Amino acid sequence: VDSVLGSARAFVVHQNVKETIFKIQKDLWLLMADVASLGKEPNIGSDHVKDLEQTIDKYTEELEPLDHFLVPGETQGAAFLDVSRAVVRRAERSMWRLSETEEVHESGIRYLNRLSDLCFTLSRYETEVK
């Protein structure tokens, strides 16, 4: 997830999107630490999830309502964000599978769920905002 988001950051054209992705990458380091040390107090909590939701709302305010399906790949940055979304969804499913045998912090799973939505929103932003 971190690597593909780094690739997206290299290609997006909006500076605010670059900054948002970089912040997410730092959060992912915390999430990776949580997964590496299951059973300990999590670094990623509900405040991180709330922050993602607020970020999604902030970007969504600048977008037109969505009334059609989107075809991925309008720009290089958007394409990498589309791939990032798929990779994040895969990571979320892996966390759910892991939770069947290990004590996984629910906040980490919620974070990944919201992150995939943010990737979708950022891809739209890269495509639609000039």
Predicted regions and their residues:
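Phosphate/pyrophosphate-binding loop motifs in nucleotide- or prenyl diphosphate-using proteins
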Residues: 2-130
